Design a protein with these regions (language model features):
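Short, histidine-centered active-site or binding-site loop motifs used for metal coordination
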Residues: 19-23, 76, 138
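Conserved CoA-thioester-binding segment of acyl-CoA-metabolizing enzymes
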Residues: 1-56, 93
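A short, small-residue-rich loop immediately preceding and capping a beta-strand
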Residues: 99-109
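Secondary-structure transition/capping motifs at alpha-helix termini
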Residues: 47, 95-98, 126-130
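Glycine- (often His-adjacent) and acidic-residue-rich active-site loop
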Residues: 57-90, 110
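CoA-thioester-processing core
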Residues: 91, 111-141
Length: 141
């Protein structure tokens, strides 16, 4: 299946996922990215012999900057907010409960939902290039 924001390759028994928000300089967890990520994990779980996946950013700017706050501006009802939260939790739970071993390769900003995504993985590794900035800035929103 073709995806807009994620591509992956399989090397031996490991899938390498590249997060790459189309037409953006940085990755954010938009509803489209979350839906694709959930679909990709489901697809990978069906591949016989696959034992795990590595998730990394294809962007030099960093791993994932967090939720797509521009989407927040479009929410007008409590039900829409709840649906957005439930979609995010479903995706993170999919990663946490997958039988596949998951590894997040981190660099640059790993903020808010991006940090939650990294924490949903079994392992987190930091690239030696550059710096890591991890945290939950939404406490200030």
């Amino acid at each position: 299946m073709d995806y807009q924001h994620i591509r992956y390759e399989i090397h031996d028994k490991i899938a390498v996922l590249y997060l790459d928000m189309k037409d953006k300089s940085a990755n954010v967890l938009s509803q489209a990215m979350l839906a694709e990520l959930e679909q990709v994990i489901t697809e990978l779980e069906q591949i016989s012999g696959l034992i795990g996946f590595v998730m990394k950013s294809a962007k030099p700017s960093g791993f994932v900057f967090g939720a797509d706050i521009l989407e927040f501006e479009t929410l007008t009802t409590e039900d829409e907010v709840r649906a957005l939260q439930e979609n995010a939790m479903r995706c993170l739970t999919k990663i946490e409960t997958s039988h596949l071993v998951s590894v997040a390769i981190l660099h640059g900003p790993v903020l808010g939902g991006g940090l939650e995504l990294a924490l949903a993985c079994d392992w987190r590794l930091c690239q030696q290039t550059g710096r890591i900035m991890a945290g939950f800035p939404e406490a200030n929103l």
